[in-house]
């Protein structure tokens, strides 16, 4: 229950090399592919409008580029970060913000390359937690929702209104922040953890 508070700088010492740097490196590769597709496509200018074959070639290149962009956004939406002793959710809050920052950067850079601007899709479901204390688990859920709403508003997007908060569940309907023992299952066997791309905390 926050018995040991970890400040943002220390959290970033884990989140940066485990989440931010690898995902930005992946995006750099995808961005290079997108840039190459767009640069090789026939260009339209005020003096030269594209027609027929050139227009079709440019349309195909832009569709391929957009497909790469959307595939990376899907990667971010499906990315999962787990804190198996999440306390009141400080690591989850920071991880959510960083994943949303990456998505925002990806969408902005894709738009600079000429692709349509994307709306934020990464949400609280990307962070998973396990916490023994019911009170701390509920605080973690609230922290994650506060993080989602604060990020959306701070970056000029409207937060969800109906509902403002929805239950934090994965695709199978399991709580993303689970109130249970992370080490032992109720029958005394080893506890199973949810599938995650990275473990933080």
Region spans (language model):
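SAM-dependent methyltransferase catalytic region
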Residues: 3-201
């Amino acid at each position: 229950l926050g018995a040991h508070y970890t400040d943002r700088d220390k959290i970033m010492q884990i989140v940066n090399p485990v989440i931010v740097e690898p995902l930005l490196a992946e995006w750099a590769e995808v961005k290079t592919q997108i840039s190459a597709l767009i640069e090789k496509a026939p260009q339209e200018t005020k003096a030269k409008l594209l027609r027929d074959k050139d227009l079709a070639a440019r349309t195909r290149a832009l569709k391929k580029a957009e497909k790469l962009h959307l595939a990376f956004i899907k990667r971010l939406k499906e990315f999962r970060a787990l804190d198996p002793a999440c306390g009141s959710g400080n690591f989850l809050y920071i991880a959510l913000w960083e994943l949303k920052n990456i998505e925002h950067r990806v969408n902005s850079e894709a738009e600079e390359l000429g692709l349509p601007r994307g709306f934020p899709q990464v949400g609280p479901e990307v962070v998973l937690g396990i916490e023994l204390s019911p009170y701390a688990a509920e605080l973690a859920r609230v922290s994650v929702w506060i993080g989602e709403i604060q990020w959306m508003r701070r970056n000029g997007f409207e937060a969800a209104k109906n509902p403002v908060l929805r239950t934090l569940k994965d695709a199978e309907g399991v709580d993303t922040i689970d109130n249970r023992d992370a080490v032992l299952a109720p029958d005394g066997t080893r506890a199973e953890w949810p599938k995650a791309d990275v473990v933080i905390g």
